[in-house]
Every structure is written in structure tokens, then in C-alpha cells.
Amino acid sequence: IVFSPLQLGYSFNHAGMPGTISLSAEIFIDIVANILRQLFQQGWKRAVIFSGHNGNWPALRVAVQIAREAYIDAQVVLADGYPRMSDEHRKNRFVRNFDYHAGLTETALVSYFAKDLLDTESIPPANQDMPDAIKKLMNKKDLDEIDTVLMNAITPQHTQALSTNGIWGANDPSLFEQIPVRSAMESYVDFYVQLIKRWDALEL
């Protein structure tokens, strides 16, 4: 069974930006945990949760844990919400260019999913407002796993502390066509189709 998506999620770090509405962590966790518990109560044993918003993940992990504590035989997969691209792309995106939100990659995703909603004539420029500590790490010559962990640690938890227009990244969003979104999404879909088939073949 494929359920309707939840239209609201956990986006506290974007609170204060025009038009941004977020559920509290407690409410979001409660909603997801209740959905899972009711499904498991009705006899379902497995669930796959897809979330394209990475900000949902900490709360989703808690919701899944709550539901699985109540139903010890339940099985849940939290599907990575990001298209399957190379490790080098991820490093360039998240550390080298700080392209976490509303930048080059997410503009490419909007173009892929809802091209008619993308006003290519009004795409804002890259972000130049991020804190100096983040810029210093971005410009480091040889990036490694420690740098990735440090980037997560030093990143402020509110968009207003990073950007005036919501864009986090230092790369130009108008160059979105260079991102291979179609092939990445095809790989993403194939990965989870194969996962579900293998999962289905396993005995409960």
C-alpha cells in the first residue's frame, strides 16, 4: 500500500523565512509513530519511509524507534531522500560548496520534478553570507571525513544565520542543468525497487 505524503514536516531550522511552516519535533514524531503503530496493529509487518527533506531524519529515527519498541517484529527502512550520486559529488555539494539548501542541486531537483514551477529568469545568486568558519573549511585544499563531521558541527541551526534569501550554497543555482539528476533518480528508483524485491523474498 502506498500512502499519501505528509505535507508538513520538521523544518525548524528554516523558521522565520517567508512562507516556512514547521511542525514541532514532538508533533512530527507523534504523527509518524502513530501511523506506523496503527499499521503494525492492523497486521502489516514492513514499512518503507521516504523523505526528501533531510531535516526530517532525526525525528523520523525517533518515530521509527518508538513504533518498533511497541511492535518488536516490525521492520522499517528509512529510505535515503537524496538521489544516488557519486561520493565526489556529495563531497563537492555538502562541504566544498555548502550546497545544502535551495542551491544548485535542489534547483536541479525542482527542475526534474516540477519544471513548470521553476522560474529560470529569477533564480537568485549564490550565497556569500555564510560564517567565516564555514568559508575556511570550504576552502581547505584536502577535504576528508573529519571535515565533513566538522561542517555538520559548526553549521548554525537557523537559515537566517546563514543566508538572507534561503540559499545556503556558494555555487551558482542557475547552472542547475549540469547536475545529472535524471540518471541519479533512475538509479535511486532502481535501488529501492531491488531492495523491496529482496526484502519481500525474505521470510518474516
Mark where each language-model region is.
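Extended, histidine- and acidic-residue-enriched regions that form the cofactor-binding/catalytic faces
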Residues: 1-46, 54-204
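Conserved SAM-binding loop
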Residues: 49
